[in-house]
Design a protein with these regions (language model features):
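C-terminal leucine-rich, beta-strand-based interaction scaffolds used for sensing/assembly
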Residues: 254-404
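The catalytic "switch" region of P-loop NTPases
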Residues: 125-126, 141-261
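Alpha-helical repeat scaffolds in large eukaryotic proteins
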Residues: 23, 110, 114, 158-165, ...
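P-loop NTPase nucleotide-binding core
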Residues: 2-135, 144-150, 154
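Short beta-alpha junction loops
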Residues: 52, 181-185, 381-385
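Short linear interaction motifs
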Residues: 1, 116-119, 158-162, 198, ...
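Short, hydrophobic, well-ordered secondary-structure elements
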Residues: 14-16, 135, 178-183, 214-217, ...
Length: 404
């Protein structure tokens, strides 16, 4: 599977959790899932092939140990490649492209597993004869491919992403793969049917839903030692209990309990989401930081029943948006191109709803940003050309107002 997530979505953290498990059955047990066939899952050995340069210390040792144990258990050979050797091989093929990237990844996998020169079919057959299967793990793609829009790097990334297709063609498949990759790399590599590709792997996307949002909010409270929150409670409390506990943080509503204001938890989640309902953990972390800073500057005894007042929460959102856009323009190429073009063309009038032509938004950018939840197009004909909208988490950062 391809696990797509933005920077900070938890790709490397998840990669490390899987590596620590050593086999698929143990990982499923850790995350509270039951294996359809525990015996088969136990034989699915975790084997890291590529990982991030940022993995250091104990985490790096864990990855290395998982790889060495996997090499012994799979029993395909005793020699493997180090991370630096793998990185050098990738760099060499980027310069020369002596090997088609499909062949390159096959050779790299075979050599890393200790059986250089073997095809995927041959590796699969050897695993079958030994009663084993393997889950190949790839992370840190952005460390070895720093310019995904360059043609050579695009071809390399596309081939890696499509490795799962080639593995799926094996009869009696004993080789699987988990490829952790940033969304902008998928955009750069998959030129056709991007939406179809994303849909295919949507079940594996590293995203946060409303329940995990509440659990993270409560966990952050536990780390900050406020509202009596506990680390254990972040996992064990029901959604209703979490909502009730968090009222000490931000109240029931963005006003008094009998007001017509929105419910606080729902309001924060909606303010931090994109237009597909996706939320990123780092957005909530910075929301807490900015809201706390605003609260310190403007303490109001009227809201003594909560830690964060409605005013502080409202003021935090534009600050979150500005940081969000700064990060997202580095990760999402169509957003970067559009933002830079608006600045270069000195487009000052930016209001919602808007038309693509009024803000120099090109059709291919619109398509990509719509799929990513950055732009929403309302098809109501009564709106005319001005039918495009931005979520709040992007609006202020892109300097749009609501006066349209």
């Amino acid at each position: 599977a391809v696990l797509v997530g933005a920077k900070g979505a938890g790709k490397t953290c998840t990669f490390l959790q899987v590596c620590q498990s050593r086999n698929w059955a143990t990982y499923l047990q850790r995350v509270g899932e039951l294996a359809h066939d525990a015996g088969v899952a136990q034989q699915r050995i975790i084997f890291p092939v590529l990982w991030s340069d940022n993995v250091e210390g104990a985490a790096k040792a864990t990855v290395g140990e998982t790889k060495n144990i996997g090499l012994r258990q799979l029993d395909l050979g005793t020699e493997t490649l180090s991370l630096s050797e793998i990185q050098r091989q990738i760099e060499t093929n980027l310069e020369s492209e002596n090997y088609h990237w499909d062949d390159f990844w096959t050779n790299l996998i075979a050599t890393t597993l200790g059986c250089p020169g073997c095809s995927l079919q041959e590796i699969n057959q050897q695993l079958s004869s030994k009663g084993h299967s393997v889950v190949l793990m790839f992370d840190g793609v952005e460390d070895v491919f720093k310019k995904p829009s360059e043609s050579k790097q695009t071809r390399a990334i596309e081939s890696l992403l499509k490795l799962v297709n080639r593995l799926g063609e094996l009869s009696n498949q004993n080789i699987g793969a988990l490829i952790f990759v940033r969304i902008d790399y998928v955009q750069a590599a998959i030129k056709q049917n991007l939406g179809q590709f994303m849909s295919r792997f949507s079940a594996f996307a590293l995203i946060w839903n409303p329940e995990s949002f509440l659990r993270l909010a409560y966990w952050l409270c536990a780390k900050a030692e406020i509202v009596g929150a506990t680390i254990e409670g972040a996992q064990t409390l029901s959604v209703e209990e979490l909502i009730e506990k968090l009222t000490e943080l931000w109240g029931h509503k963005l006003g008094q309990a009998d007001s017509k204001e929105g419910h606080s938890a729902r309001w924060v989640y909606a303010a931090l989401c994109d237009l597909t309902g996706r939320f990123q953990a780092r957005d909530l972390v910075r929301f807490f930081r900015f809201a706390a800073e605003e609260e310190i500057k403007n303490q109001n005894a009227f809201w003594a029943d909560r830690i964060l007042s409605p005013e502080s929460m409202r003021k935090a959102i534009p600050r979150c948006s500005h940081e969000k856009v700064q990060e997202a323009t580095l990760e999402i190429q169509p957003l970067r191109s559009w933002s830079e073009r608006m600045d270069a063309e000195n487009i000052i009038e930016r209001s919602i709803p808007f038309s693509a032509s009024s803000v120099s938004l090109q059709s291919d950018e619109l398509t990509a940003l719509r799929e990513l939840g950055v732009v929403y197009e309302d098809l109501d004909p009564s709106l005319g050309e001005k039918r495009l909208f931005l979520p709040e988490i992007y609006r202020a950062g892109l300097r749009f107002d609501l006066s349209g």
